Swiss-Prot record:
Protein known as: Holo-[acyl-carrier-protein] synthase
UniProt: Mg(2+) binding residues: D8, E57
One GO cellular component term: cytoplasm
Similarity comment: Belongs to the P-Pant transferase superfamily. AcpS family.
Broadest EC class assigned to this enzyme: transferase
Lineage: Bacteria, Pseudomonadati, Pseudomonadota, Alphaproteobacteria, Caulobacterales
Length: 133
């Protein structure tokens, strides 16, 4: 059963300007180590960061809180499954909020779709509760 849906559209140019202005201060506050490593390897790092930023915003909306109530950018990270499919890893307040949404006997699954077409990056998040195995 679907328990949360969120989407976000991010202007890559805005992220590019933020990277130029704040650099590591922005990336270390907003992104996980894994996200920083992956984005810094990309030829268009602003696009990579923008997709991840959109994913965090979309995830916070799917959690039903936005970026408040203990849900912070640093508590959500884009990770890839062994197949390469992207998903979200949650910690702290984001993980606590997710746990509170899931009915007893169910396990959460976070589906993530990312895309970009300059100057925009977009993310969709669907949080599903499936029977625990």
């Amino acid at each position: 059963m679907i328990i949360g849906i969120g989407s976000d559209l991010c202007d890559i140019r805005r992220i590019e300007k933020t990277l130029e202005r704040f650099g590591d201060r922005f990336t270390h506050k907003s992104f996980t180590e894994i996200e920083r490593r992956r984005s810094e390897r990309k030829p268009d790092r602003a696009s990579s960061y923008a997709k991840r930023f959109a994913a965090k915003e979309a995830c916070s909306k799917a959690l039903g809180t936005g970026l408040k109530g203990g849900v912070h950018l640093s508590g959500m990270g884009v990770v890839n499954l062994p197949s390469g499919k992207p998903t979200m890893a949650l910690t702290g307040g984001a993980a606590e909020r997710l746990a509170s949404m899931v009915p007893e006997g169910m396990t959460p699954v976070i589906h993530l779709s990312l895309t970009d077409d300059h100057p925009y990056a977009q993310a969709f998040v669907i949080i599903e509760a499936v029977a625990a195995t």
